[in-house]
Amino acid sequence: MNRRTFLNTAATAGILIAARERTPGQARNPKRRPDPTTVLAGRTLKQLAEQYRRDLFEDFLPFMDKYIIDHDLGGFMCNADYTGERVNTNKSSWFEGRGTWVYAFLYNNLAREQKYLDVATKSIEFVLRSRPEGEDELWPKELTRDGKPVTQADGEIYGDLFIAEGLAELSKATGNKQYWDEAKTLVRKCVRLYDREDYRPAIGQTYLGRTARPFPGARIQGVWMVLVRVATQMLEMRNDPELEKVAKRSVDAVLNHHFHPGFQLNNELLNHDLSRPANEYSQLVYTGHGIETLWMLLFEAIRIRDNKLFDTFADRFRRHVSVAWDDVYGGVFRNLMNVDANLWTLDKVLWAQEEVLIGSLLVFERTGAPWAREMFDRTYAYVMSTFPLKKYGSPVWAYAGNRKVEFEEFKTRPKRIENYHHPRHLMLNLLAIDRMIDRGGKR
């Protein structure tokens, strides 16, 4: 299907939220909601759930257990290739926070087994030993196996926010309220740093390359994305007015400022005052973050029971996926460097595809919208035919590739095992499918 056809497949469906629920569970229109006979991606819901379980419990988790998890010192040694061969034993503070969240979430929602809680606990204990001393200092980005800094913080707050996300989810798993309090302290620190007018001047290089002009104090869609995800998960555990303000501020920034009415797409970078820059950055649309941010905002609309907001974010999610879709080889591109010139980065990253799968399944679960089913079906077919490496003897999936995601090119990329976006997709979608099955009275 070409992009134009996909954009016009179905008029926007009325998307409402069952006000009594805080998690996605029931579509407003019971005549359209999925039932156990629903077929997605050529499978019944039960068959699809079984596939997701195999991908998670038979492939991903055993590989992590055998090759990546440091059972002695705690944490994750993710610098390894698809066979499990390690490049080194260094660890990343980003991947520690992310990994803690993954295993704590797994324990809380899918498999209440002590071994998973132990992995999460040992990871957070490991990374907390390298906690920075200064109130506004950030975590070292890379650590040795025993926790000594290899590289210092690079000025981005993402790593500390991922640690906060892990702490909060571990607090839920253990009942240790101190972990939640520490997470809030980290969020507050990150907001302070983000609000500085000189925050992260080199941010443009992430999207436009080394020659990108400095952009100190830019407002970054990716930062709002992580802030709202961390804050709203924490608010599911405990009411907190300060975190509510963080969540509302993040939603407002994306909804009313990053959204470009002319493009009907989200700009990644804005001026510090949230005005649109009068230079090349006004043409930058990082579709990967746009898609990822919007499914998170769908969850937030559900949490705050705002039906109209859900509708808006569903429409914008659909628009971003449609524009980013590669009509020739399939999948979505992640980086539209210049809208008017139609200038894209032509690689394919797994995480961006998995964000499409999360968002489209969420919309379909709650509405039964034909366009969401179609989006999920074709993206799932593309992903499953492109990224899994079983044909090469590995249970993991390629984390990135060129436009065609060719295996020989993938092998030339940095050796890394992705321990966050992939299991997050598997877990969130497995939970969504199970909810759909449960509501049909069959399991």
Regions found by a protein language model. Give the residues of each.
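N-terminal export signals
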Residues: 5-25
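Glycan-recognition and catalytic cores of secretory/periplasmic carbohydrate-active enzymes
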Residues: 25-443
